[in-house]
Amino acid sequence: MRRYHKMEKIGEGTYGVVYKAQNNHGEICALKKIRVEEEDEGIPSTAIREISLLKELHHPNIVWLRDVIHSEKCLTLVFEYLDQDLKKLLDACDGGLEPTTAKSFLYQILRGISYCHDHRILHRDLKPQNLLINREGVLKLADFGLARAFAIPVRSYTHEVVTLWYRAPDVLMGSKKYSTAVDIWSVGCIFAEMINGVPLFPGISEQDQLKRIFKILGTPNVDSWPQVVNLPAYNPDFCYYEKQAWSSIVPKLNESGIDLISRMLQLDPVQRISAKEALKHDYFKDLHRPSEFLNGVH
């Protein structure tokens, strides 16, 4: 760790503490110190293997993992440093982002996800806090692959409950078959939040989360989602809700935007659009280079 000088603590994420630091060459980076639950066992070798794979991910919309430093009891991941995230930006922009900015960010999120899915790596915990943005308006996904390496804890390093707001209904209902569709659900939730300025499904428990989802998308049944009856938490007595029109949920979205979000936020994971398909959607046909309309992101 002598190569890095800690400058300040910048956050406490799901897995541990994050510091802003400087290396011997004067470059700024982010150090993510991973907390290990099993104090006696040290770092699981599977985790180190998984993390090493992430060093091979190189894409403009993925936060670069520069280095991995591990001792017996501590694992430190060294990432490129970005000083803004989508949550901070949304908090500062009352009423949602400009439509062109939201479109650019969504496209970049999908590019990063498509790349990772092509490499068979899932995120499983996408949320505005781990979508980082630089001063040129380039968006990068952070924490890809960490869920598989360390499992997503119920409570974070600071004992805050890890958010359920972006979690897919199949996962909430106990599905262990994680597929690329779990990330697409999260992206759909983030898309709605960028447009509306508020979270789409701000649940306070797993049950409340499902209820909020069903209130908008309708209560699932065997016809709409054939596999739902096989999920551990499926309850045939779920309160019945009618599906609502997307135009009333995201009124600022145009027709092609509504079509795209409706394909992302399908209850049945099999029916969700893939990242690769989403990138070809009509919604993006008028997209220009990101930097053209992101001069307001600082």
Curated annotation (Swiss-Prot):
Superkingdom of the source species: Eukaryota
Modified residues (Phosphothreonine): 14, 158
Regulation affecting activity: Phosphorylation at Thr-14 or Tyr-15 inactivates the enzyme, while phosphorylation at Thr-158 activates it.
Protein kinase domain ranges (all copies): 4-284
Binding site for ATP: 10-18, 32
Quaternary assembly: May form a complex composed of at least the catalytic subunit CRK2 and a cyclin.
Name recorded for this polypeptide: Cyclin-dependent kinase 2 homolog
Species per Swiss-Prot/TrEMBL record: Theileria annulata
